[in-house]
Amino acid sequence: MNAKIYGNIPRSHRIVIVGGGAGGLELATRLGNSLGKRKIAEVILIDASLTHIWKPLLHEVASGTLNSSEDELNYFAHANKNNFEFFLGKMFEIDRHKKNILLEEIIADDGQILAPSRSIRFDTLVVAIGSTSNDFGTQGAKDQCIFLDCRSQADKFQKEFLSLYLKAQAQVLLDESNKAKQDDINIAIIGAGATGVELAAELKHAAHQFCKYGLKSIQPKNISISLIEASSRILPVLSEKVSNSAENELKKMGINVLKNCRVKRIDHEVIYFEDGRKIPANLKVWAAGIKAPDFLKDIAGLETNHLNQLVVRPTLQTTYDDYIFAMGDCACYIPEGASRAIPPRAQVANQQAIFLEKALKDHIEKKTLPIFIFKDKGSLISLSEHNSVGHILGGVNIEGYIARLMYVSLYRLHQVALHGMFKTSILILKDLLSKSSRPHLKMH
C-alpha cells in the first residue's frame, strides 16, 4: 500500500489539481479512475465555476449556435462518478513551505458566500488554470470589449448580440425608411487567430439563421463583421496556404478582413488604428493574444515568463519545486533544441493529461520521471456548420466537409476522455436526435 502513516492514521498521497479546463479535468478523471479508485492517492480538483464546457466551443456559445446549458458538465456530479473530489474555489496564492494553496471566497450575485476563503493542503500540486486574453495595454480594450475566456463571457456576448439585433430590428419596424440603411449592426473582432476567425464565421451563420426564424427586416448583408489582424495574414501560426484558404472563405461570407491593422484605442462606438483609420463598432470582441492570469506572476517565488506562465522542465515540474507541476496554457515548456515554447492548444493539454497520469504515479513511487514529448497532430479551424480548414499530421492541408468531420471529432475525443466510449456514443445519439427538434440558434 502506498499510503503514508501519521501515527495510527493512514493518509494517502493528496494530488490537488487547480483548474478544470480541458487538461485539468481530463487529468482529474484519469487519476480518479486509477489512483483514486484504488485508494493510492486522494485526487482533488478545484475550479471557480460549477460547470465545465470545452473552451474551443466558446465561439459557438457566443454566437448562440450552441446552447451552453445543454453541453456543460457539472464538476460535482462528474467527480462523484470518477473517484475524485471537487472543491469550488479560486486560488490566489501558494504556500510552498506549508504545502498549502490559498483560495479566495466565491460570492454569488446576491452577495451570499458560495465558497469561503480557505487553505487546501497538497502533497503534489498541478496548476492547470489556463489563460486569459492579453489586451497588451490597449487603451479602452478592457472597458469596451468583451473577452471570450470563459462561459460567462461567451453568454454575455450572446445576449448582447441578440439584444443589439432585436433593437435594430425594432428600429426598422418603427421607421420604414431605415430599411434602406446599410451596416445597421457593426461587429468588430480584434485578433484573427483561431478564436477570432471561428467567431466571425459563426456570427455570419447566426445572421442567416435570424432571417430563417422570421427576423427578416435586418438582412445578413446589413450586419457588418470586421476581423482585425495586426500581422500580414490571418491565422499567422498556421501555414500560408491554410491562412489564404480561410481568408477566401471568410470573404465569400461577406466578412471584412483587415490585415496589418494595429489598434491604437477603442471607445464606445469606434475603433481607432495607429495609421489614422477608424471603423464603427457597436459590439467589440478582443481575441488577440493570451497570457496566464496576472496573479500567477512570480507566485510563491516560482519562475514565470513575461506572459505570467509557470516555466516548467521536460517533466512538467516547475523549475524551482519538484512537487508543483504545471500544464496547459498556464505553463511554458521549451523543448530541448527548440527556439520557442509549445503552443497553447487543446491537443497539448490533452497530451499532457495523458503524460501526467503516468508521471504522477512515478512521482508518488519516487521513480525517475519521464520526459514530455509533444506530438503535433495538426490544427483545424471551424468556418461554421459545414466547413473547416487546416492541416493534419504530416502537413497535409485539408478543407471542406472532411475537415469539418475531423474538427467535430476533436470534441468527441474530449468527451471520450471524460465519459468513456459508451456514454459518448449516447451523447452523440442524443445530439443527433435533438437537432431535429431544437432551434439551431439560441433566441433567449
Q: How would you name each of these model-derived features?
A:
Residues 144-175, 269, 278-351:
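FAD-site-proximal beta/loop scaffold in flavoenzymes
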Residues 177-238, 245, 256-258, 343-360, ...:
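Rossmann-like dinucleotide-binding core of oxidoreductases
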